[in-house]
């Protein structure tokens, strides 16, 4: 069995989530709203582009098929919005700030994100996984910190 280095595996997981956000057809509220939650995004580059947000309901769909997704204009350094269309008792959010509003996450020559990105929960240094990004839908706001 061949083992991939941890860095490569972790980056692949991060980019898988980014692809899910990028590949999703964005709309204000893609699914019927069952549960709504307040989302607070910190470290936003104020007034630049938009936040591309995807919400996943379980490990099987994480990075593949979001249950809800939306675009949010980048406001202040801390941007707050309501995300609806959620169900269940757990959710994981992934997002990036599309600085140039081209609908795609910018990448450098190594394929690393060149635009700010983040996830809910306690993301690892090399990108989120379901286990690190999942948070309870208990009425508390979800806080996401964007990595520059």
Regions found by a protein language model. Name each.
Residues 16-29:
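C-terminal segment of classical bacterial N-terminal signal peptides
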Residues 35-43, 53:
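A short, amphipathic beta-strand motif
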Residues 52-56, 92-94:
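Beta-strand signatures of extracellular beta-sandwich domains
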Residues 71-77, 136-138:
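Short proline/glycine- and polar residue-rich coil/turn motifs
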Residues 78-86:
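Exposed aromatic-hydrophobic patches
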Residues 89-99:
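A short, solvent-exposed beta-strand micro-motif common in secreted/extracellular proteins
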Residues 99-106:
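Acidic, glycine-anchored loop motifs typical of Ca2+
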Residues 115-148:
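Extracellular beta-sheet/turn segments enriched in Thr/Pro/Gly and aliphatic residues
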């Amino acid at each position: 069995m061949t083992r991939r280095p941890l860095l490569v595996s972790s980056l692949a997981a991060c980019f898988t989530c980014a692809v899910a956000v990028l590949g999703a057809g964005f709309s204000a509220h893609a699914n019927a709203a069952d549960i709504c939650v307040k989302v607070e995004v910190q470290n936003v580059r104020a007034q630049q582009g938009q936040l591309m947000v995807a919400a996943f309901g379980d490990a099987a769909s994480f990075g593949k098929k979001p249950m809800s997704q939306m675009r949010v204009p980048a406001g202040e350094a801390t941007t707050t919005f309501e995300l609806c269309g959620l169900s269940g008792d757990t959710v994981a959010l992934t997002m990036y700030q599309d600085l140039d509003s081209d609908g795609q996450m910018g990448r450098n020559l190594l394929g690393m994100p060149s635009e700010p990105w983040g996830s809910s929960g306690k993301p690892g240094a090399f990108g989120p996984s379901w286990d690190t990004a999942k948070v309870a839908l208990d009425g508390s706001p979800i806080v996401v910190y964007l990595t520059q």
